[in-house]
């Protein structure tokens, strides 16, 4: 007799992740991202950090890792803890960590030509690419570009996906697809590790995807965020006029606002916090400041009041 879903909750989970969820994910990313793999190549964990904690011992023979910038501290810290030398924007490193659909905080996407160049260069050097496909679901203004995993034919690339944007940040479920050489390495040591992701959440997500709800959710959120991002851009232009520069990409939920400002970003952040506003400052110099504005966790009705408050703080 096959176990019921309730019965499954009475046992420990598969260290690699629930088999049915791994199969559903293999089918899903094959259809959505043309990532061709088997369920045996997929490893599930509670967030990207957990995934990287499993990956680093498999690639301990490599010594250097490159990140696009210093903003992904959660990722670079894991590699540093395992003895990797962390560098930035250096394609000659042994490991290259990249998010092609999130090259900048405001959603610039790596073009296909650059992806092909990176895949070929890494293959020639023997480097491993880690493709974090963060926010690939939210590409609005151009056709989705192929994954690096697909362009590399499934070799020399580790593909990482997660669901924090599509579902809830509190649902800590991420996965990685290992190329054949690393998949064999992981299989030899899998039983040494415990599964970090909730078994109940894995079972629920599996059914959610099977029933078509994830595809439906993605379509709804993609439409919603595209509309909200455009509305935010319009509100920023209305508030700051020609005095500002706005940078937007083809994906994501944020834009970058550059505006004249003579004081320090630290002062601005402190004053903003006093008014209940949290600011992410991307860059500042003696004459201007660049701030990241996100539409994801604020209602459209609050765009105008938020922009007006920011304008007052900048002009104090």
Place the predicted regions along the sequence by residue:
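Conserved core of the PLP fold type I
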Residues: 3-126, 130, 136-138, 143-155, ...
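N-terminal "arm"/small-domain region of PLP-dependent enzymes with the aminotransferase-like
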Residues: 1-14, 274-277, 282, 293
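Conserved glycine-rich beta-strand-loop-beta hairpin in the small C-terminal domain of fold type I
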Residues: 223-233, 244-258
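Active-site PLP attachment segment
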Residues: 150-185
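Active-site C-terminal subdomain of aminotransferase-like
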Residues: 182-201
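Conserved PLP-binding active-site segment of the aspartate aminotransferase-like
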Residues: 178, 256-261, 278-308, 312-313
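Structural signature of PLP-dependent enzymes
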Residues: 186-190, 211-233
